[in-house]
Amino acid sequence: MGLQSFSYALYDQPDLVAAICQRVGELTLATVAHAVSIDNVGMVFLGDDLGYANGTLVSPAVLRRYIFPHYRRLLEIVHAAGKLVLLHSCGNLERIMDELIDLGFDGKHSFEDKIMPVEEIYRRWGDRIAVLGGVDMDVLARGSVDEVRQRTRAVLESCAAKGTGYCLGTGNSGANYIPAENFVAMLDEGQRWNRERFPGTDR
């Protein structure tokens, strides 16, 4: 069921929407329960795009009714196994960010400068949830090596100076349209910054 059909069904067939979400939730929870039983699995990566540039794809009320209860149970299962959950979600989640944190997500990935720069995310929520990535994909894909280095350093100065709660990385999933030299520049600048900021460590 695509977004358009889902949106109509929310009005015309709410029982169908509830049944679909319940079944998807059951399958997801069963998969996650098996995954966290494996010793080598230390974290669950939940990729679930909830938003677009201006807000959530559906209203927060819809998410609270149909989606968040399954998130809550998933997080309970993973945390009971002593493991972590990273949420990867694109879009503007400002209206639901506090709720996602209260549900218990350990980390959040996928940030875009034109929506909300990662520095602002870290300033507002970095004391409650780990922030991963944030070097904007547009800079990585179209910027020069120097621009990538400058942006990487700016992100680190704002988000990593305390040494906790932030992990350097791309703003979204690494893609084959990022020039290799730009990706390497981001990593190299991160290592340089760490050596300068935390001398005597292996970071």
Feature annotation, model-predicted:
Residues 1-203:
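Active-site loop segments of alpha/beta catalytic cores
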